[in-house]
Each structure stands twice: as structure tokens, then as C-alpha cells.
Design a protein with these regions (language model features):
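Hinge/lid segment of periplasmic solute-binding proteins
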Residues: 434-488, 505-506, 613-620
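Extracytoplasmic/periplasmic solute-binding protein
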Residues: 476-487, 506-565, 579, 587-592
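Surface-exposed loop and turn segments in beta-propeller and other repeat-based domains
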Residues: 104-127, 188-198, 319-324, 403-404
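Long, aromatic- and glycine/proline-rich binding clefts that accommodate carbohydrate-like moieties
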Residues: 666-761, 765
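Glycine-centered hinge/linker elements that transmit conformational signals in sensory
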Residues: 547-579, 601-608, 614-620
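Short, solvent-exposed loop/beta-turn-alpha elements that line the ligand-binding surface or hinge
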Residues: 449-462, 540-561, 618-628, 769
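Conserved N-terminal structural module of periplasmic/extracytoplasmic solute-binding proteins
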Residues: 22-87, 97-99, 103, 148, ...
């Protein structure tokens, strides 16, 4: 599948996918034959001595090498000191290893440079040597970038360790050395880098075929010969280097943001960059070229090969099909015949070498299920874990974001929905962005209630039943999710009450108590935002996808329109540079704030907005609580899935306590599983206490330990001053408040948003004073009714 780097991929993926991990065929026609070859992956666990912590890697003609910072000897605990943590005074240093074919790591005859000594009588002096980079050198050797860093204390405190401003009084000095080593680790040469004031950034370095080192710095790129002499110092202007890699011809290429993403090569002799291509896409990372391609790069879950001659690129493989995640890779390099060698760090801590080689396409021994998604990167980790744990079923991802182009950002969604309606539906769906309710109403999705009821380990009482009910369509569950967040409005309890939920009348009564000149919400909130959320909140009342019946002429909709009309339109909203929500609330000029609860920490932070006590009151509704549930990530099964047992094995993992506890945070949000939710609450309620420099707990005047913040953040309130928010341990009252909000939320968001868009369009005339509420409701009723029944 080819394209130029001057446009985003528009060629469609072939619907027949490889059984290995190769690229789809370049066709937009269902049933086109897949390539005869794919990629197969073979993993070898790397075995290092106990305590080794490999972090840098290089592949040379002599094989795979690693650099590890590790314990070299036991340290002596200073007299009168106690350990803050095990190994605090261990002697640490660097070792280099060669990795054998069997994965065994053997140490090299390598000695780091000695740490510098203090010859100036500096207080609190310490020094260390670090390995900052590892690259292949000509003739199978190694290039090692080493640093010597000195640190000393310049403050006046008699005991520097007790100086509360210790880090403000510490100065540093660093030197860098480029060492060329033989394959056995013995030194071939060593040169001091002639930095001349250049402050290097060590996040990304590389070397060319002649052993010259390329080192980014602020606004600069330094090029250094093996003896350390500076060959070039190239100004980048406002550019920022995202990635460096060696081209197939031995030169170095860099990915640079400079009024757009651009690919350059470096002319060290002339001291300038030469532009190769201007890119519309945003590559994640560059890898050294070799074999068929001048350069490789990762985009999403695919490895692409670039040919500079015509600017074309080709999908080489899909990482997920190789049981790999690009985020796990520390190294990937071509090794001839189209093969690759890589190093990946797995979630369980194992480090593995992976060999990717072309193999004849053969039938898989496992049942293969397809999962359709609008973004493979959002589902990749879950699919990868499942595939690695299974020997009967394997999931293959169809990523429809590959159809998106610069002119049509909905092309992927259009393609997927078109295929579904044509009968070519994936076995599983990631539901973000999809018309979930419509698909369920058409009978295209599997009813998951029987599967949940038959599950020997999962029980409904283990989950928040109200959250499950909020995801139902026509009284049936078609979706699973590991967790959810809550979109809500928050206000002072003394004004809005202490129980979630209020009616429009109760809202008006509270608003009447605010002083003149106040606003209900912040100056950036407009009526379109409010209308959209209110539509999501009440959609189940106004639209029945199962029957196709709509009722926007319900008096509740007229009341909703009237409520939304009080907010400014989008053109009238503004950013109040002189005051934030926090400032306006503190001054009594703003009644409510929009917020979300995605984690336990959010509850602790949110409460600090209203020191007198707060309530997650939600949007006003005529009954219940107006807090909106938002599934973190939803998955569904096709009603015609090829292996429903296998599909359920995948879906059920998201509901387990183990999954929701282990992957709490970004992947989960607030856990749907009650036990996982309870565990997260318990962790949030753990109190941390102050310690002194020796690790002893500090006590207050009553002999009690002193609680301390677990962290914090600063938020600018007026463009200059900053309000500090501290992350304290959650209190029982806060835990009870969160649980009440969760258990009282009954409505979830429609992630497709099509109906909300129709409502927004139809309401514009009402907000402009051109139509009455009744006329507007009648118009919206007609349009939504037509849309809903077209979709059924």
C-alpha cells in the first residue's frame, strides 16, 4: 500500500488480512487476495545477571549490545543514618553486555571513565559517570557517549541535607566523552566533546556510518567526530527535533518541526540541513534504513518503509499482527532479507529480543476474529494482551483511520458503517465514534445479557448495575466497558443542596440568590455546549431506537430549550484573562463549574474549588440526577460473529476486577467492577506522612504523625498568580460523595452525536428569535424522526 509523504494515506485497506503480520494488499475491493508472504515474530527472553537494568541498546555487525546501570557493590551506611529505601547507599555503576543467540547476556571488558574528584574544596561535593548513548560504530564496534557530572552545594546551611531550599543551592558541571570500543568492550579511542557551551539534549542521539555523533541541543544540532572535535553546529531556529535515524546510505536523517513536519538530512561538511520531504502526516518515530527502504518509521501500529527517490512509502508490517506494541520497542533495525531485529520490554518486566522475518502465508492454527476500530492505537494494548494469553483465538485489528484523508476526516467512519450495512461486519467493534444505538436497534449487535448471566465467574452484582443499564438499548445490553467517567456540574452545597440532582425550578431558585453581575458558569461556556450535553442527557427520553419513535414535542424538551437559551452563543463567549473559574467562584461571581470525574484524584482536587463544601449537582432535569456517564471505551460483538465464545472471552476481560485494578487510570477511568472501585478508593484514602531527611516520621505537638500531600498542581488564576491544588488523601466524606454520584447517575452519552447535531442545527433559529420553542420542537421532531428511521 503506497503513498507519498506529501499527502495522508487515502488508499483503502484490503479486507482480507494476512495471517502473519504483513501489510494488507493495496486494494479497496472486498475479497482481494492477500500477499503470499507475511511477517512472523519469534521472541527470545534476554537473561541478564540479577540486578542488571538494561536501558540502552545497539545492534552492530557483531550482534546485540546493551548498557545497564546496576549495583556494583554494597555501600556503607553512614553513621547515624537510616535507610529511606533498600539499596540507598549501594555503589552503582555501568556495565556493557553482549547478547548471545540464546538470549544470555555476557559482560564486556569495559570500564567506565573514572568519576572526577573535588580539587576545589566544594561543600557537599559528589560526582558520577553515566552512559548516555549507545550506537553502532564502523567495523562492528561500539560508540559510547559517557558523561561526567559534578554536583556541589553553594548554600549557607550548616547541614545541607536539612536545607529546605537545598535544590536551589546546587550547581552542576558536566563533560561528555565519545568512546569507540572494540566488539569485546576494550577501548579503541576516546575524545572529549568540544561542546563550546552547547547544552545537549540526550533524549535522541545517533551516529552516521563513519562513526560521527549527532547530538540535539536547544535550537541546535551538534555533529562530532570520533575524537570529540566539532564538525558542525547547525542552528535549527524554532525547530524541534523529534527523531533521528541513519539512512540506508549511511547519512543521518532528522524529523524536525519547522512550520510543519519536515524530514532533513545533515551535511556536516557544509554545516547545514538539506530538506528531503515536507510531511502532512506526523510520524511517531524514525528507524534506521536498510534492505529495500532508505528509512523506516512508525505511524500508529504500522511500520512503514520510505524510498527517497520518489517519496513513496509502503506498509511493511502491522505491529499488532506480530504480537508487538510499538511503545514496547527500545530498538528496531533491519538485518537483511527484509528481516528485522528488535528489543521490547513487556508489561511483566521481561525484556525480549524479537526477530521479524518474512514467511510464506499459512492458515492460522487459531480462530481469527476481526475487530473494527476508528483508532488502532486506542485498542492495541488490550488486543495485544489478549492475543498473548490465548492459544485458541486470535484477534486481528481493522483500523479504519487508515481511510482518513485531509479532505474527509469522517472517511474512516463512513467506510466502516458502509461495510457493516453491506453485511461485511467485523466480529468485534470498538464503539468510540460509532452509532452504537442504531447498530443495536438494527439487530447487528449481539445481546450480551445471556453471556454475562452464563459467565461462571462474573456476576451482575459485581458491577455497577446503573452503569450497565445506562448503556442498554431497548432494555438489552450490547456493550461492555472497563470503566467510565462522569460529566457534571458542581456547586456550593449551601446554595445547591447536598444531594445530586435538581429540577429546572430548583436551578432557577438557586440562581436567583446570586448577586447581580454573576454568571451561572464560566465565560467560555456557550449555549451549544449546554444544548449538546442536555441532549445527551435526555436522548433516551426523546428517541426510542428500537421502535423508531421520537418525541421532541414533549414539554420537557421545551423546558430544556428555555434553559439553554439563557447562555451566550458561541460568538459571544470570551476568555476572561483576568479571572479563572477558581477566582470567580472564590469572589462569588460564578455559581457553578463544569467538571468531570475520571479518577479518584479528581474528587480531591475538585473539592478545593469550594472550601465550604460542594455537591456534584449535575445539569437540571425534570427527574433524577443530571450527571452523565461516559464509558471509557466500549466494545461490542457482531450478532453474526464467527466465534462468539472466543469473542466473549475477549469482552469479559474488561469486566474483571483484575483488569480494572491492573490497568486503572487512562485505560479504565472509574472502575465498573465494584471490587476494583473499592480498591481504588482504599488506595486514594491511604494517608502519607511527613518524614525528615533521615527517613523518620515527623510528629506534631501532640506526638501524632503529620499528614502530607501526595502531590499537587498549580493553576494560573489570572495569567500571573497561581492557585495551588494539593492531592491529599481522600476522606470518607469524599468517598461517600463520589459513590453517591456514581450510583445516582443513570444516563450515558451518545458517542456518535448525530442526533445532537440535528438538534443543535434546528435550535439555532429559536435562539436567534426567529422561531418559537413549539415551532422549533416540531421541526426537530420531523428531522430526527426521519434520520432515526433511516438508520433502523
Amino acid at each position: 500500500m503506497k503513498k507519498t509523504w506529501l499527502r495522508i494515506l487515502t488508499a483503502a485497506l484490503c479486507l482480507s488480512l494476512l495471517c502473519g503480520c504483513g501489510a494488507p494488499a493495496p486494494s479497496d475491493t472486498a475479497g482481494t487476495a492477500a500477499p503470499e508472504e507475511g511477517y512472523a515474530s519469534a521472541f527470545t527472553r534476554l537473561r541478564f545477571p540479577e540486578g542488571a537494568q538494561p536501558s540502552l541498546w545497539a545492534l552492530t555487525d557483531g550482534g546485540l549490545y546493551a548498557a545497564s546501570r546496576e549495583k556494583l557493590a554494597d555501600g556503607e551506611v553512614p553513621e547515624g543514618k537510616t535507610l529511606d529505601y533498600e539499596g540507598q547507599y549501594d555503589v552503582m555503576g555501568w556495565r556493557l553486555y553482549h547478547i548471545g543467540e540464546d538470549g544470555a547476556a555476557a559482560p564486556l571488558a569495559y570500564e567506565p571513565l573514572p568519576a572526577p574528584e573535588d580539587t576545589e574544596g566544594r561543600r557537599g561535593f559528589s560526582a558520577e559517570v553515566g552512559v548516555e548513548g549507545l550506537q553502532s560504530a564502523p567495523d562492528g564496534g561500539l560508540l559510547v557517549l559517557e558523561s561526567q557530572t559534578e554536583r556541589w552545594y553553594t548554600g549557607e546551611a550548616a547541614n545541607p541535607e536539612r536545607d529546605p531550599d537545598y535544590w536551589d543551592h546546587v550547581e552542576y558541571r558536566s563533560k561528555y566523552f565519545l568512546r569507540t570500543l572494540e566488539a569485546d568492550g576494550t577501548e579503541r579511542s576516546c575524545g572529549t566533546l568540544a561542546l563550546d557551551g552547547l547544552e545537549p539534549y540526550l533524549y535522541e542521539i545517533t551516529a552516521d556510518a563513519e562513526g560521527n555523533l549527532y547530538l540535539p541541543a536547544e535550537g541546535m544540532l551538534g555533529v562530532f567526530a570520533p575524537d570529540g572535535s566539532a564538525l558542525a553546529c547547525i542552528a535549527l531556529g524554532d525547530g524541534w527535533i523529534y527523531s533521528l535515524a541513519r539512512l540506508r546510505d549511511g547519512r543521518v536523517a532528522l524529523l524536525l518541526w519547522q512550520n510543519g513536519m519536515r524530514l532533513f538530512t545533515v551535511d556536516a561538511e557544509q554545516g547545514e540541513l538539506q530538506e528531503l520531504l515536507a510531511l502532512d502526516s506526523f510520524p511517531d518515530r524514525l528507524y534506521n534504513g536498510g534492505g529495500e527502504f532508505d528509512l523506516y518509521r512508525t505511524e500508529g501500529t504500522r511500520l512503514l518503509g520510505l524510498r527517497l527517490e520518489d517519496g513513496s512509502e509502503e506498509t511493511v508490517l502491522d505491529y499488532l499482527d506480530c504480537d508487538l506494541s510499538p511503545q514496547e520497542l527500545s530498538l528496531l533495525a533491519p538485518v537483511g532479507d527484509g528481516s528485522f531485529c528488535g528489543v521490547c520490554s513487556l508489561e511483566d518486566g521481561d525484556v525480549q529480543r524479537v526477530a521479524l522475518s518474512r514467511q510464506p502465508r499459512t492458515a492460522s492454527e487459531r480462530t481469527e476474529l476481526t475487530l473494527g476500530t476508528l483508532s488502532a492505537t486506542t485498542v492495541g494494548d488490550a488486543v495485544l494482551r489478549f492475543n498473548r494469553s490465548q492459544d485458541r483465538v486470535r484477534i486481528r485489528v481493522r483500523d479504519y483511520s487508515d481511510y482518513v484523508n485531509g479532505e474527509d476526516y469522517e472517511a474512516g467512519l463512513t467506510k466502516l458503517v458502509t461495510e457493516i450495512l453491506a453485511g461485511d461486519m467485523p466480529d468485534l467493534l470498538a464503539l468510540d465514534g460509532l452509532p452504537y444505538a442504531q447498530l443495536a436497534a438494527r439487530g447487528l449487535l449481539e445481546d450480551l445479557d445471556p453471556w454475562l448471566d452464563r459467565d461462571a465467574e462474573l456476576k451482575r452484582e459485581d458491577l455497577f448495575a446503573n452503569v450497565l443499564r445506562s448503556m442498554e438499548v431497548g432494555g438489552r445490553l450490547y456493550e461492555v466497558t472497563p470503566g467510565f467517567s462522569i460529566i457534571t456540574m458542581m456547586g456550593p452545597s449551601e446554595l445547591v443542596g447536598d444531594t445530586p440532582g435538581w429540577t429546572y425550578e430548583e436551578y432557577e431558585a438557586a440562581w436567583a440568590q446570586m448577586p447581580e453581575g454573576s454568571t451561572p458558569l464560566g465565560p467560555g461556556v456557550n449555549r451549544d455546549m449546554i444544548l449538546e450535553l442536555c441532549t445527551y442527557l435526555n436522548l433516551e427520553r426523546f428517541v426510542d431506537w428500537s421502535s423508531g419513535k421520537c418525541d421532541f414535542e414533549d414539554p420537557a424538551f421545551l423546558q430544556m430549550l428555555s434553559f439553554c437559551a439563557q447562555f451566550p452563543d458561541a460568538d459571544s463567549t470570551y476568555y476572561d484573562e483576568g479571572s479563572s473559574d477558581m477566582t470567580r467562584i472564590a469572589e462569588g461571581r460564578q455559581m457553578l463549574v463544569f467538571t468531570s470525574i475520571y479518577s479518584m484524584d479528581d474528587v480531591v482536587y475538585n473539592d478545593q474549588l469550594f472550601p465550604g463544601g460542594s455537591t456534584y449537582i449535575g445539569l437540571p432535569v425534570d427527574e433524577g440526577a443530571g450527571n452523565i456517564l461516559y464509558p471509557t471505551s466500549g466494545f461490542a460483538m457482531s450478532a453474526k460473529c464467527a466465534d462468539k465464545e472466543g469473542a466473549w472471552a475477549f469482552l469479559r476481560t474488561f469486566l474483571t476486577e483484575e483488569y480494572q485494578t491492573k490497568y486503572s487510570g487512562y485505560e479504565v477511568g472509574l472502575p465498573l467492577n465494584r471490587s476494583a472501585f473499592r480498591s481504588a478508593l482504599d488506595k486514594a484514602m491511604e494517608i502519607e506522612y511527613e518524614k525528615d531527611a533521615e527517613g523518620h516520621y515527623l510528629l506534631d505537638a501532640n506526638g501524632e504523625r503529620i499528614p502530607t500531600s501526595k502531590g499537587g498542581m498549580g493553576v494560573s488564576t489570572d495569567g500571573e498568580s497561581v492557585m495551588e491544588f494539593q492531592l491529599w488523601a481522600m476522606t470518607q466524606a469524599q468517598a461517600d460523595k463520589l459513590l453517591a454520584v456514581v450510583e445516582n447517575a443513570t444516563r450515558s452519552v451518545d458517542r456518535n452525536g448525530s442526533v445532537a447535531a440535528i438538534v443543535r442545527e434546528g435550535a439555532a433559529a429559536y435562539f436567534a428569535g426567529q422561531k418559537s420553542a413549539e415551532e422549533t420542537a416540531h421541526l426537530i421532531q420531523s428531522r430526527v424522526n426521519l434520520y432515526v428511521n433511516e438508520q433502523r
